[in-house]
């Protein structure tokens, strides 16, 4: 191992710890290329199962736990290991990632569980980072890795059941993409995933969202198009989505993707909390090389998220409240 690699990521870990962050999650989009079927960190078209070679599941698990132990020994409190991401997708031709069937995820989880125990770690496994909520509770939503709560936690599914693993977090992780276009989706889909999670006593974690989809409907209170929407319209809708994730989905964790980025192609602030601009930019959009320096500017999205994270602290509990007033998400 060369522990000087990923210096930028390590810098942010150091700064986060300095500012008081006391829980860290380590995630992987792909196994190291020496363990993959095609020697790449993305998959070939038509790959079966996953891009992780069949004889390297234990090796990948050991890589994850060795890395976790290294940072634990350096004083970081690594609470979660997140080994797969959006397993429903193909992840071909250049974008880092791997498809995973439920069977392959279960196989990796079992190896990772053993390796965590062997290394004497306290970190737990978080799964499965579903690309959208429906893949967690129903069949036929995506081309693979569907109905994942049942697959992993129903004992009758012998090939994929992992609910008895000692080091598996009693939570289910997914993403709020593709399910925020209408008020009905914001409510019903989130209630569905919560209801299914409750059958197996699982927390629900929302671990990745930005405004990746066509614009929400005007009936949901959004302008007629992204072109017509202001930066504040986008931020306020993000606040509405967080509210629905917390209240209808009872989600115990919420994360945004990504912290900072360059604004491009008329997308405004759909994909960042902080905007990066390179030297010489004349407006908000930026297409230059950030390695040449520039500026970082906060955005209203940061304050939307901050007004949740500042006032809803770890360990807080929601109190049930029933009202006879008609619900109005707008």
Question: What are the residue ranges of the model-derived segments?
Answer:
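Surface-exposed intrinsically disordered loops and tails
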Residues: 1, 33, 39-52, 139-163, ...
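N-terminal catalytic cores of secreted or lumenal carbohydrate-active enzymes
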Residues: 1-79, 93-106, 110, 114
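Conserved beta-strand positions
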Residues: 26, 83-86, 127-128, 174, ...
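Short glycine-enriched loops at secondary-structure junctions
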Residues: 27-33, 84, 210, 260
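Short acidic/His/Gly/Ser-rich catalytic and metal-binding motifs that mark active-site loops
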Residues: 32-44, 88-93, 134-137, 213-218, ...
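Noncatalytic carbohydrate-binding groove/subsite architecture in carbohydrate-active enzymes
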Residues: 57, 69, 74, 96-241, ...
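Aromatic/acidic polysaccharide-binding cleft in carbohydrate-active enzymes
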Residues: 206-310, 319-325
């Amino acid at each position: 191992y060369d522990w000087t690699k990923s210096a930028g990521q390590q810098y942010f870990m150091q700064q986060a710890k300095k500012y008081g962050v006391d829980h860290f999650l380590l995630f992987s989009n792909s196994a190291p290329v020496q363990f993959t079927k095609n020697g790449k960190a993305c998959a070939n078209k038509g790959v079966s199962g996953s891009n992780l070679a069949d004889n390297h599941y234990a090796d990948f698990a050991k890589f994850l736990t060795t890395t976790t132990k290294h940072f634990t020994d350096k004083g970081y409190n690594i609470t979660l290991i997140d080994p797969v991401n959006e397993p429903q997708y193909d992840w071909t031709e250049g974008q880092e990632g791997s498809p995973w069937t439920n069977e392959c995820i279960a196989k990796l989880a079992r190896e990772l569980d053993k390796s965590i125990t062997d290394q004497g770690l306290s970190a737990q496994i978080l799964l499965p980072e579903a690309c959208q909520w429906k893949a967690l509770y129903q069949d036929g939503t995506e081309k693979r890795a569907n109905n994942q709560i049942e697959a992993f936690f129903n004992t009758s599914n012998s090939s994929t059941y992992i609910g008895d693993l000692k080091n598996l977090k009693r939570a289910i992780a997914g993403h709020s993409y593709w399910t925020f276009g209408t008020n009905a989706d914001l409510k019903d889909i989130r209630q569905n995933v919560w209801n299914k999670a409750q059958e197996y006593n699982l927390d629900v974690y929302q671990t990745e969202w930005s405004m990746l989809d066509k614009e929400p409907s005007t009936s949901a209170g959004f302008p007629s198009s992204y072109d017509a929407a202001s930066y504040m319209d986008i931020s306020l809708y993000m606040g509405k989505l967080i509210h629905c994730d917390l209240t209808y989905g009872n989600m115990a964790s919420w994360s945004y993707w990504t912290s900072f980025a360059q604004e491009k192609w008329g997308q405004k602030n759909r994909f960042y909390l902080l905007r990066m601009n390179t030297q010489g930019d004349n407006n908000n959009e930026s297409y230059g090389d950030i390695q040449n320096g520039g500026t970082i500017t906060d955005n209203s999205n940061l304050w939307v998220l901050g007004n949740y994270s500042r006032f809803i602290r770890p360990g807080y509990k929601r109190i049930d409240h029933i009202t006879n007033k008609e619900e109005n998400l707008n």
